[in-house]
From Swiss-Prot:
InterPro entries: Jag_KH (IPR038008), Jag_N_dom_sf (IPR038247), KH_dom-like_a/b (IPR015946), KhpB (IPR039247), KhpB_N (IPR032782), R3H_dom (IPR001374), R3H_dom_sf (IPR036867), R3H_KhpB (IPR034079). NCBIfam families: Jag_EloR (NF041568). The gene is khpB. Residues 141-207 form the R3H domain. It is found in: Cytoplasm. This is RNA-binding protein KhpB. The lineage of its organism: Bacteria, Bacillati, Bacillota, Bacilli, Bacillales. HAMAP family: KhpB. Pfam families: Jag_N, KH_KhpA-B, R3H.
């Protein structure tokens, strides 16, 4: 946590100066007034500036990345974590020369669990919610492509047999991929059935 004392003619001027010196934003600092400004005799002699002590709040993305890197180190994973940002999401991409299958887990379950923990760490303090997406060697895109192909294949089967086809249980995110992939098809419908970890998508011919 970075601390610094900064002075200015007024408290507000000191705050603005602190933001410039620390290269941050007003939302990411807290400050206490150490000394109030004094105008002095005739506004000149004996005047004293305002002095504030500024504390920069830890960046939630940096905090989450440090947590993830420490966790991966404990797992003996020699990998690199890179960050990409867009207006809606922060992407943490894990890459390395070793096999990342263990890190990804069956159907990405281990990766999803790590993503959940990383988001908890990033958002443990009050403030704007930050959504972090965790990926490893482009697994998410490859999995999405596989799910779309599966959805199209099973939709054809449902139409051919004129019977509903049930998919294996999936996470809410993966079920959404299936629903979205087939929503433009006019001759099939999709819906979810089951509870908890057994919840799955059903693809059925429209009646």
């Amino acid at each position: 946590m970075t601390k610094r004392r900064v002075s200015g003619k007024t408290v507000e001027e000191a705050v603005e100066q602190a933001i410039i010196e620390l290269g941050t934003t007003r939302e990411r600092i807290t400050y206490t007034v150490v000394e109030e400004p004094k105008s002095g005799l005739f506004g000149i002699l004996g005047s004293k500036p305002a002095v504030i002590e500024v504390v920069v709040k830890p960046d939630p993305v940096d905090r989450a990345k440090a947590f993830l890197e420490e966790l991966l180190q404990e797992m003996d994973m020699e990998v690199e974590v890179t960050i990409e940002k867009d207006p809606a999401t922060v992407l943490f991409n894990i890459s390395g020369e070793q096999d990342l299958g263990t890190l990804i887990g069956k159907r990405g379950q281990t990766l999803d669990s790590l993503q959940y923990l990383v988001n908890l760490v990033a958002n443990k303090e009050e403030g704007e919610f930050i959504r972090i997406k965790l990926d490893a060697e482009n697994y998410r895109a490859r999995r999405k492509e596989a799910l779309v192909q599966l959805a199209e294949r099973l939709a054809s089967k449902a139409l051919r047999t004129k019977r509903p086809v049930s998919l294996e249980p999936m996470s809410a995110h993966e079920r959404k991929i299936i629903h979205t992939a087939l929503q433009e098809l006019g001759d099939v419908e999709t819906y979810s059935e089951g509870q908890g970890i057994g919840r799955h998508v059903v693809i059925a011919p429209k009646r």
